[in-house]
From Swiss-Prot:
Changing D12A: No change in activity on hNav1.7/SCN9A and hNav1.5/SCN5A and 3-fold increase in activity on hNav1.4/SCN4A. Changing K31A: Loss of activity on hNav1.7/SCN9A and hNav1.4/SCN4A, and no change on hNav1.5/SCN5A. The modification Phenylalanine amide is found at F34. It comes from Grammostola porteri. The presence of a 'disulfide through disulfide knot' structurally defines this protein as a knottin. Expressed by the venom gland. This is Toxin GTx1-15. Changing Y32A: 9-fold decrease in activity on hNav1.7/SCN9A, no change on hNav1.5/SCN5A and loss of activity on hNav1.4/SCN4A. The mutant [Phe5Ala]GpTx1 may be used as a tool for probing Nav1.7/SCN9A inhibition in vivo.
Length: 34
């Protein structure tokens, strides 16, 4: 299961849906990185 943009997540545990979506350690949600 994966999470979409700005969905709450647990760093190092949850997987965000796209390769350039990562779980932010600061905000604890999936955000885009470029």
């Amino acid at each position: 299961d994966c999470l979409g943009f700005m969905r709450k997540c647990i760093p190092d545990n949850d997987k965000c849906c796209r390769p350039n979506l990562v779980c932010s350690r600061t905000h604890k949600w999936c955000k885009y990185v470029f």
